[in-house]
From Swiss-Prot:
Binds 4 Ca(2+) ions per subunit. The keyword Zinc applies. This is Zinc metalloproteinase. It comes from Renibacterium salmoninarum. The gene is hly. Its EC number is 3.4.24.-. Keywords: Calcium, Cell wall, Hydrolase, Metal-binding, Metalloprotease, Protease, Secreted, Signal, Zinc, Zymogen. The lineage of its organism: Bacteria, Bacillati, Actinomycetota, Actinomycetes, Micrococcales.
Length: 548
């Protein structure tokens, strides 16, 4: 079955305190701080004993920062990789500096990236580093074959055979392949003490709105990870007019696409007058509301450039959407109207009547998350992924002046849609979701996340993150903590800065630390008028939901 990341329904930096030594593994040397003064360093650990955050008592202004570090500074500060106990031979490349006070680096070993790795530096207003959050591998085992290309070709043949099993060969298309170092901990699937092994990662399109990502060990061809993705949610809007798509047909993916040369032709494109189809106009307007909110309240800048798609039809890279789609498959039969919406491969797809502002913002934020930190869609990182989509979806809903923004609907997800209200961020328990970490309604971590356990409770456990966002924004006395809200403008910038810091395998503990760090950075950089008093309220909210 295909996976819907629909509107319905992580340990960081491995190895600092690890005592497990795998045979043949190359371990990191004793973590000298290099050019950093160890007396200036405060190290925080996760519950599993891994390095989670480095804070400097005095901001680091030493070389190579003779002057304030600019957005173009591409080198990690000397000694920081040792503090995170990076594997020998590691170097770090800058992969994001779109936010002037947050810099995100990827770990590489011998020039090959480590999947899921990152070290994020947080800078003050003068460009000095105040803290860092990281997820790195501390050791490697094995080596890539001397003939890298030949090894990759052999692994591709194996991966293609697996991806093609039970599928029409015409539906399988390779979209990306690369050599990587694979450490299961960094994608939330391994135990403390694991090491990085040489591997190849292959991404295939395997059917309707579906992709499959296979990671193959370079040394023995073992399958290290097998993931099927479908992200449930530019301005090019196409109308399917209740056309039924067989999800199991070999050409279903092509039948979904929106563009002049695609199966679904544009009904309304940028600058055109309103359509006679209400859902087309709703989506056209809400795509704009989402892009405008991100542009005004985050450093994401151009949302079209970040998550848009170019179908080669002369309309360029655009935020594309198909409305009024119907679907059928062998398990659920025909669904018309299709009571859902989803994001996949730069395009939004909606069933009739689910074209609301919060659902649009929710699903497009899955695209933003995919392009920023790539939160793994399982267990706690998956719950944070879902919560981030609810948070920004509701921020957009509460800020665009829509007629249904009543007091009763504030913090409700799905109001005005054919689904009705499906979640309450203010009161998650009303819909069977937890408001406190590992409290009532919490779904346990799954050792084998799959559709039967909601990938480890990604929709249910998002309630903790949703309650947290409500508390930070509006405030409330809850679970022994009194929180004064800081408002949407400050909260949106706070969550955006935290989004930039989170690693792919983030836990709720990681989210709490990232929010505290982001708040301090926003004060130092005078973002949205954030104050130290606001940060006290953020800390109180984090305590209230039990994630610190």
């Amino acid at each position: 079955m295909k996976k819907y990341y629909a509107v319905t329904g992580i340990a960081l930096a491995v190895g600092m305190l690890c005592t497990t030594q795998l045979a043949g593994a190359t371990q990191a040397a004793d973590p000298s701080v290099g050019s950093l003064d160890s007396s200036n360093v405060v190290t925080e650990f996760s519950a599993q004993g891994n390095v989670e955050q480095i804070t400097f008592k005095s901001a680091i202004k030493s070389a190579p920062m003779s002057s304030a570090r600019s957005a173009q500074t591409s080198a990690i500060i000397p000694g920081l990789k040792n503090l995170f106990v990076s594997a020998p031979g590691s170097d770090f490349s800058l992969n994001d500096s779109s936010n002037n006070y947050i810099k995100r680096f990827t770990q590489n070993i011998a020039g090959i990236p480590v999947l899921g790795s990152s070290i994020t530096e947080v800078l003050d207003g003068q460009g000095a580093v105040t803290s860092a959050i990281g997820a790195v591998t501390s050791a490697t085992k094995g080596a890539f074959p001397a003939d890298l290309a030949a090894g990759q070709a052999a692994a591709l043949a194996s991966a293609t055979k697996i991806a093609s099993a039970g599928k029409d060969a015409s539906a399988i298309s390779l979209v990306d392949q690369k050599a990587i170092w694979f450490d299961a901990v960094l994608i939330g699937k391994g135990a403390t003490g694991s090491v990085a092994v040489p591997a190849y990662q292959f991404s295939f399109t395997t059917g309707f709105a579906e992709s499959r990502v296979l990671t193959v060990a370079a040394n023995d061809g073992a399958i290290l990870n097998d993931r099927t993705d479908r992200k449930d949610i530019n301005r090019v809007v196409c109308d399917a007019n209740s056309k039924v798509i067989d999800l199991e047909a070999s050409n279903a993916d092509a039948l979904l696409k929106c563009g002049k040369t695609q199966a679904n032709k544009p009904t309304r494109i940028e600058g055109q007058a309103a359509s006679s189809v209400a859902d087309v106009n709703s989506v056209y307007n809400f795509l704009n509301d989402t892009a405008s909110f991100y542009g005004a309240n985050t450093k994401a800048n151009d949302l079209t450039a970040l998550i848009g798609n170019d179908e080669g039809d002369g309309l360029g890279k655009a935020m594309r959407a198909v409305v009024r789609i119907c679907v059928t498959d062998s398990q659920n039969g025909e669904q018309c109207p299709f009571a859902n919406a989803f994001w996949y491969n730069g395009q939004m797809t909606y069933g009739q009547g689910v074209t609301t502002d919060d659902i649009t913002g929710h699903e497009l934020t899955h695209g933003v998350t995919e392009k920023t930190n790539g939160l793994v869609y399982a267990n706690e990182s998956g719950a944070i992924n879902e919560s981030m989509s609810d948070v920004f979806g509701e921020f957009i809903d509460l800020s665009n002046g829509s007629s249904d923004d009543t007091a009763a609907n504030r913090w409700a997800i799905g109001e005005g849609s054919s689904l009705g209200v499906i979640r309450s961020m203010k009161d998650p328990g009303k819909y069977g979701e937890p408001a406190i970490y590992k409290g009532s309604n919490w779904k346990p971590t799954a050792t084998n996340p799959n559709d039967n356990n909601d990938q480890g409770g990604v929709h249910s456990n998002s309630g903790v993150g949703n309650k947290l966002a409500f508390l930070i924004t509006d405030g409330q006395t809850f679970n022994g903590q009194t929180v004064t809200g800081i408002g949407i403008a400050k909260a949106a910038q706070l969550y955006w800065a935290a989004q930039r810091q989170l690693t792919a395998n983030a836990t709720y503990s990681s989210l709490g630390k990232a929010l505290n760090s982001a708040c301090s950075a926003n004060v130092s950089n005078n973002v949205a008028g954030t104050t130290a008093a606001n940060c006290t309220q953020v800390a109180n909210a984090i305590k209230a939901v039990g994630i610190k």
